[in-house]
């Protein structure tokens, strides 16, 4: 399965549009990690704990659109858009959407 943010795939022709596919992942962060992340923010640097959570959420959401596209008989997803949002209570939401297509 090819997943891309572009609307076309070089070297391939889109033969059928199967529909819009969406995947979401909501991840919570725990209090200990929040504390250490805030310490990192104060002294500078990157928060590895949050980066790991972000990667996990993104991977889960991408896997969802891949599964949903396959269920529609697609072999690619084009025009992928990723959105990130931090909600209350230390929740991180990643939503991914794209168009499931069949390519040759």
Swiss-Prot record:
InterPro entries xref list: UPF0145_dom_sf (IPR035439), UPF0145_YbjQ-like (IPR002765)
Cysteines paired by S-S bonds: none
Family, per entry: Belongs to the UPF0145 family.
Name of this chain's protein: UPF0145 protein RD1_2695
Lineage, opening ranks: Bacteria, Pseudomonadati, Pseudomonadota, Alphaproteobacteria, Rhodobacterales
